[in-house]
Amino acid sequence: CFVPIPWLINFVRANLGAQDTLLPFFSILTAPDTLMEEGLRFAAIDVGSNAMRLFFCRVLENSHGPTFVKESMIRMPLRLGHDAFTTGTISNDTCDRFVDTMHGFKALVRAYDPITFKACATSAMRQAKNGMELVGRVKNETGIDLNIISGKEEARIIIATHIDRHLKPQQHCLYVDVGGGSTELTLIIAKKALASKSFPIGSVRLLEQQVTKADWAGMEEWIVNKTANIKNIQSIGSGGNINKILTLLLKTKGNSVTISEIESTIKKIEPYS
């Protein structure tokens, strides 16, 4: 579902006075295989509304500070948001599949042996009435401590990827992370996070028709208020939908994408959705 993208394009043009570019941002860098023998290995489990992911990376130290090198990523397309956003409860069958997946992730964590790992759940688990019950089951059956984080904490973690390193000293940007259940916006001025907020707008919610006009209005109002006196803001995006557009455009990670390129891609894929 690419519904958020046209809206973002129109808003950038109408309100931000930005250049005709949206820049997808990726905090994980690539490195030669020879570097894989160095550094410290960490792992993370991300329980999203559209999928679950287990991610391994190594942290290498150099003259510019720590560099995060992607080592491996496993994705399980278990859409918790389908249940959570339509019925308010994660079904028994989905819960069973969820726990089975966590067992598999735990086995891989043991095999990779990182120095530490953390597991977090976001929008779907926040909304599900039985979210905490499922957290307890995961702990009892797998030993994994799964943390359901708030939208505010989710935004904080996203901005902690040190995006400021990739910005010029006086560059202003609106960082947009589009997930399955929520979208996190962070306004960065002169390499400092000035404000951030999470909104209940995401690809799964849109597919399930769970996003209201009030949700869109709330996001627009926040952006207008926070950027009223700021000009030349560049949009920087991340998330599965934005990544997919990058792939369809045959762009390499970190490259700029023009608004016209995104509009052209949307026109091509609309007949198939």
Enumerate the predicted regions with their spans.
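N-terminal basic/disordered segments at the start of proteins
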Residues: 40-62, 67
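Helical "lid/coupling" subdomains associated with nucleotide-phosphate turnover
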Residues: 42, 56, 83-114, 119-172, ...
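A short acidic Gly-Thr/Ser loop motif
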Residues: 46-51, 176-182, 238-241
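Beta-strand initiation motifs
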Residues: 63-71, 192-194
